[in-house]
Amino acid sequence: MVNGRIPSVFSKTYVTPRRPYEKARLDQELKIIGEYGLRNKREVWRVKYALAKIRKAARELLTLDEKDEKRLFQGNALLRRLVRIGVLDESRMKLDYVLGLKIEDFLERRLQTQVFKLGLAKSIHHARVLIRQRHIRVRKQVVNIPSFVVRLDSQKHIDFSLKSPFGGGRPGRVKRKNLKKNQGGGGGAAEEEED
């Protein structure tokens, strides 16, 4: 770090499909994008790549002997990590179950999906907008990344930000305008719907 710049990461976080126009895969990806409110195919490929790396590690460990030190140490670390993010159930803490994981298991743990499932947003797309506009916090930290992976222990701490109009902060522009009109004008005009 000679010039004070933070070095960038050069490894890709996704892998493009080998066959670009495979109808079954294209349909499946489009269905996933619609269901989880993703922006593009790259978001699907990124999760697919992360899952592939995890499954590859599990397959490698399964080839070793059950009493092998490496298998015990790395296998337990992998399983604990998957349980912590809520992808794997505690009752299924075996490497065999890691091979059965699907993309949907990881997409369910995204902040965008969790905000929608908790009922903080009207739709999965609304959830993405709320997150990007900094209305959502996890514990005390405002998170504005829809792909943020929510840990199991953080799930119950997802809420509206304290500064957000939804969370009791300063009212939004339209609401302030209506309040000002009601105080000053004396109310000849009908009130706009407040959300």
From Swiss-Prot:
SMART domains documented for this protein? Ribosomal_S4 (SM01390), S4 (SM00363)
The GO terms this record gives for MF are: rRNA binding; structural constituent of ribosome
Q: Where in the cell is it found?
A: Cytoplasm; Nucleus, Nucleolus
| Residue span(s) of domain S4 RNA-binding | 109-183
Keywords assigned by UniProt, alphabetized: Cytoplasm, Nucleus, Ribonucleoprotein, Ribosomal protein, RNA-binding, rRNA-binding
One GO BP on record is: ribosomal small subunit biogenesis
Location of region: Disordered: 165-195
Which InterPro entries does the entry link to? Ribosomal_uS4 (IPR022801), Ribosomal_uS4_CS (IPR018079), Ribosomal_uS4_euk/arc (IPR005710), Ribosomal_uS4_N (IPR001912), S4_RNA-bd (IPR002942), S4_RNA-bd_sf (IPR036986)
Where is it mostly found? cytoplasm
Name one matching Pfam family: Ribosomal_S4
What cellular component terms from Gene Ontology apply here?
cytoplasm; cytosol; cytosolic ribosome; cytosolic small ribosomal subunit; nucleolus; small-subunit processome
PANTHER family to which the protein is assigned, alphabetical: 30S 40S RIBOSOMAL PROTEIN, 40S RIBOSOMAL PROTEIN S9
Please describe the quaternary structure of this protein: Component of the small ribosomal subunit. Identified in a IGF2BP1-dependent mRNP granule complex containing untranslated mRNAs. Part of the small subunit (SSU) processome, composed of more than 70 proteins and the RNA chaperone small nucleolar RNA (snoRNA) U3.
Instruction: Give the UniProt family note.
Output: Belongs to the universal ribosomal protein uS4 family.
What is this protein's function? Answer: Component of the small ribosomal subunit. The ribosome is a large ribonucleoprotein complex responsible for the synthesis of proteins in the cell. Part of the small subunit (SSU) processome, first precursor of the small eukaryotic ribosomal subunit. During the assembly of the SSU processome in the nucleolus, many ribosome biogenesis factors, an RNA chaperone and ribosomal proteins associate with the nascent pre-rRNA and work in concert to generate RNA folding, modifications, rearrangements and cleavage as well as targeted degradation of pre-ribosomal RNA by the RNA exosome.
**Full protein name:** Small ribosomal subunit protein uS4
Organism of derivation: Drosophila melanogaster
Q: What gene, per UniProt, encodes this protein?
A: RpS9
